[in-house]
Design a protein with these regions (language model features):
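Generic early N-terminus positional signal peaking at residue ~5-7
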Residues: 5-7, 41-42
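Chalcogenol-based redox active-site neighborhoods
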Residues: 31, 35-189
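Short hydrophobic targeting helices and cationic amphipathic motifs
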Residues: 9, 15-16, 30-31
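Short linear motifs centered on Gly/Pro in flexible linkers and helix caps
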Residues: 4, 10-11, 19
Length: 189
């Protein structure tokens, strides 16, 4: 309850105060809360164009008319991230049969993602959000991660409908947690 009141108070602050403040942590918190508040079920999905593991540009708009499952993951070649994406790999036929596209997104380089994709035989594209803009737009970024790393994607899952609206959103705060694969599959039906 207190968090909601605090968040509501933040949004009532005049925009000019934000423009003049030097407290970067406050600004980051404000923008994260604003993103999370605006990215609700039924809202338009933030559009993006990212470089794939095949070194090609891939845009969300390329998939208009299909459902899109976005899986954000912190880092390639780590245990839980591999489990997350291997679960999607092992169920790829289900999604493909429903005219749905799976995209994995992390802040790793496209070259790292290419090796990760090859070693795990993923049938879907892995996209590099190296500049961290898409992770931030979806409210799926850690400002502070393990070992002092900053700007790492949070584990998250989104389902985007054929008209590019968010119909499922799950952002996990604990990196070792996995998304609700059953709920994702249900939303794609």
């Amino acid at each position: 309850m207190l968090k909601n009141k605090f968040t509501n108070l933040i949004f009532k602050i005049d925009h000019s105060i934000i423009k003049t403040t030097t407290n970067i942590q406050f600004i980051v918190f404000y923008l994260q809360q604003k993103t999370l508040m605006s990215l609700t079920i039924g809202s338009p999905a933030p559009q993006f164009t990212l470089v794939s593991s095949a070194l090609k540009e891939v845009s969300l708009s390329d998939f208009k008319g299909k459902k899109v499952v976005l899986h954000f993951f912190p880092m390639a070649f780590t245990g839980v991230c591999t489990t997350q994406l291997c679960t999607m790999r092992d169920n790829f036929g289900y999604y493909d049969g429903l005219n749905a596209v799976i995209l994995g997104i992390s802040v790793d380089s496209p070259f790292t993602l290419a090796k990760f994709k090859q070693e795990n035989n993923y049938q879907f594209e892995l996209l590099s959000d190296f500049n961290k803009e898409v992770s931030a737009a979806y409210g799926a970024i850690y400002e502070q991660f393990f070992f002092g790393l900053k700007g790492v994607s949070k584990r998250a899952a989104f389902v985007i409908d054929e008209d590019q609206h968010v119909i499922y959103a799950e952002v996990l705060e604990v990196a070792k947690d996995l998304p609700d694969f059953a709920a994702i599959a249900e939303k794609v039906k």
